[in-house]
């Protein structure tokens, strides 16, 4: 059997150097556990950036995949499929929105949200042609496509890719007065993550989302929540916006929408917003394909049936409390909602992620000095306690 070092060598030889992974190869996975080619087992505390909320290879989701793969996998949108309509209904009811537009990856859904907001601004708000603006937040992460990196404040994400998309206005995260000052008659939308993930699990001030939504409604600006990473139970609520009792004008969903098995994403909004599209104005050959829809329906059913949102809230509160008790001045803050947790250090986090790997835990540094803890929501209390003891041993 091919070994870890051989696979990494092949990757380094032939793969574009656009990632810096920990030196581990995963060849098997189930639930919260993964295994390398040599048979070493590790607990997954990253969940593929929250795409695996339901756990690796959840039986119900895998069975849905196999059943659908044995019938039909792709029709394109030139024809109807028997899975798309039921999936539309499932997501519309989950988000309490009237319409859903399917894509494949989170970044594609972000691009779709940008296009939706711009067209809405021109067709409904009557902004002058080619003058629409979109407000975003510093340290955001909305993906790697041109629209998404144009919204980023990280210059390394932009280097060598210019010119950027015009009409982007960047404000500090969680700053209500900056939002008010940034809005002009040309503002189409305010796009934000309810909790910033890649920036280090940044949580806005309590009440900010609600106040920002009120400002947007007053100024006729769309409030768009990127819940790709925070949605579907990760933060202990179905959506992170729920922490402020906020229903955005538009949701952007992805990652766990496919149960860690098949990529599917979408935007969801009411008809007065998504109704700006007509046939031919936007699309995707694979978007809303029957295989993805069947998997997604099962993934959403697992979240509901196994009460994973409630588990995330309960287990997350306990783990955050435990982590805050670790006595080490190197730890400057522990923050999080549900099982979406950041441990901020006053030094680089990667060496500690490597030590955690040696102890049997897989997690990844984010924003240089933050260890992100985000296990699959199916994790047992016993396994989470085991993980905490390992983390405590490394960080104490």
From Swiss-Prot:
Its EC number is 2.6.1.13. The keyword Acyltransferase does not apply. Its cofactor is pyridoxal 5'-phosphate. The modification N6-(pyridoxal phosphate)lysine is found at residue 255. Keywords: Amino-acid biosynthesis, Aminotransferase, Cytoplasm, Proline biosynthesis, Pyridoxal phosphate, Transferase. It catalyses: a 2-oxocarboxylate + L-ornithine = L-glutamate 5-semialdehyde + an L-alpha-amino acid. Pfam families: Aminotran_3. Pathway: Amino-acid biosynthesis; L-proline biosynthesis; L-glutamate 5-semialdehyde from L-ornithine: step 1/1. Catalyzes the interconversion of ornithine to glutamate semialdehyde. HAMAP family: Ornith_aminotrans_3. This is Ornithine aminotransferase. The lineage of its organism: Bacteria, Bacillati, Bacillota, Bacilli, Bacillales. The gene is rocD.
